[in-house]
Amino acid sequence: MHHILLKALASGLIMSLFPYAAISAPPKPAQTDSLLTLLPKTPDAADRGRIYVQLADLSGDSLELAAPYWEAALAEAHKAGDTYGCKDALDFLVRKFADRDTRRAEKYIALSDSILPGSRHALFRSSLYAYYLWKQMNDNSIETVTRALEELKGKNYDRLTPEERIEWEFLTGLAIDFSSVTTEAYDNIAKAIPYVERALENLRKYPLEERLHLEKICHDELSDLYMLCKDKRAEEQIGQCIDLHRKWLAMDDRFERPHRDTTGYMMRAYAKMVYLRDLISRDKLNEYYQKCIGLARARGDMAEIYSTSARYYQCTGDYERAVAYIDSTITVYKSKGIKADLAPIYATQSYLYEEMGDYKN
C-alpha cells in the first residue's frame, strides 16, 4: 500500500493525489479582442500562427478557450514550416488531453506522423506517445496499457530503427514499473531502471532539439523509479527536467510571448522535490518548498499552495498542520470544481490522524 500511495503522490510532474490546477491570471478580453480583429487582415501563415499562439497564451487556464487556438496555431505553423511551433502545439495538446479525452490525444499523436515525418522528428513523435502511455499508466487505465504492452511484446528489437529502440527501452521500463506497482511486486521496480537509463544514454547521441522532449520524460520517469527505490539520484533527475524545460523555452526566438506560462512546470517540479523526504537534506527540502510556494503565490494558485504545504508538513512530521492543509486543499478543489480522486487524499489524511493517535477522525 505504501508503494502505491507513493507512486500516486509522485507520478511524474502530474500529481494524481493532488492534481495541479494552475490558477493563474484570467483571460484578458481587451487584448484578446485586439488580436482577433487582426486575424482577417493577416494573410501570412507565420503571422497568423503568432496571433493564435498569443491568443492561446492569453486564455489562462481555460483549456476550452486555449485548445482551439492551439489547433489553429498548429495548422498555421505547419503551413509556415515552423517546426518549433508544430512541436509546441502538439506537445501542449497531447499533454492536456492525455487524461481528459484519450481519443483526442490519440488523434494528435497520429497527426504528428504527417505534420512532422521522417527520422529527424522520430524522437519527438515518440515523446508524444510515451507521455500519453505514461499518463495512462499513472491513471491506471488498464485497457489502454494492456493493449500497448501487447504491441510492445510483438516487436522484434533487432528490426527496430535506432529511434524505435530508444522508445522500446523506455516503454519496457515503464511497463515493468506499472506491473510491479499494480501487482504489488515492489522488489521488481528496480528492474525497470536499466531500461530507462539505456534510453537516456542512447538519446545523448542526438542533437538537443531532437531529443529534448523524450529525454525530459525519461528523466521524469527515472526520478520516480529512483524515488521508489530510495535512491538519492532522484533529485538530480528532477533537476534535469527543470533544466530541459528552460532550454525548450530558450529555443523559442520567433516572437515575444509575454503571457506564456513559463513557471507552471517548474512549480510542479519543485513540488515533486518535496517528496524526496529522506533523500535530501532538510535545508534542501525547505529550499524547494519555498521555491514552489513562491511560484504558486505569484500565480495565485491556492490549490498548489495548500497541497504542497500538506506534503511539506507531512514530510517534516508536523501532521496537525498537514491535515489542516489537506482540508484546505479539498475545500479549494470543491469550490473551484477541480476534478480529483479524493479517495487517496482522504486515505492520506486518515493515515496522518492515526499517526497522531486521533482515531475519532
Question: Could you tell me what each predicted segment is?
Answer:
Residues A22-N361:
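A "functional boundary" signal
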Residues A8-Y20:
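Bacterial N-terminal signal peptides
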Residues M1-K7:
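Positively charged n-region of N-terminal signal peptides that target proteins for export
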